[in-house]
């Protein structure tokens, strides 16, 4: 028997009715012990982690770099972190990358990021 190309197979499928194609798929699954539904299940499972990321409610505000305006960033850090002295804030800024806030809600994290970036820092939310 001559080997058929993909194009020849597709042309043969185009000439078949839906019932004939359905019967072909069932027989193909039986002969090769595969199912046509397996890729759909894998795709659905792959979508689940993306949904989990969208539902994230707690964020860490991470100071990546203080930038050129280190004094302004130190002041911003002292405003954001209660009870932090000047020395501790300076050490925190100079030790970047460091988490400034951990487990903050989205609004607080966004506000802190904006404040630090306004002061000249490079900040990421994780």
Curated annotation (Swiss-Prot):
Keywords: Ribonucleoprotein, Ribosomal protein. Gene3D superfamilies: 3.30.1390.10, Single helix bin. One of its GO terms (cellular component) is cytosolic large ribosomal subunit. Forms part of the ribosomal stalk which helps the ribosome interact with GTP-bound translation factors. Is thus essential for accurate translation. HAMAP family: Ribosomal_bL12. Belongs to the bacterial ribosomal protein bL12 family. This is Large ribosomal subunit protein bL12. It comes from Corynebacterium diphtheriae (strain ATCC 700971 / NCTC 13129 / Biotype gravis). The lineage of its organism: Bacteria, Bacillati, Actinomycetota, Actinomycetes, Mycobacteriales. The gene is rplL.
């Amino acid at each position: 028997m001559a080997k058929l190309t993909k194009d020849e197979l597709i042309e043969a499928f185009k000439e078949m009715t839906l019932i004939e194609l359905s019967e072909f798929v069932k027989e193909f699954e039986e002969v090769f012990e595969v199912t046509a539904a397996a890729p759909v299940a894998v795709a659905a499972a792959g979508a689940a982690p993306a949904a989990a990321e969208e539902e994230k409610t707690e964020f860490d505000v991470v100071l990546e770099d203080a930038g050129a305006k280190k004094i302004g960033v130190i002041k911003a850090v002292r405003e954001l972190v209660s009870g932090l002295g000047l020395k501790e804030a300076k050490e925190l800024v100079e030790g970047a990358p460091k988490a400034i806030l951990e487990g903050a809600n989205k609004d607080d994290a966004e506000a802190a990021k904006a404040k630090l970036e306004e002061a000249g820092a490079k900040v990421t939310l994780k």
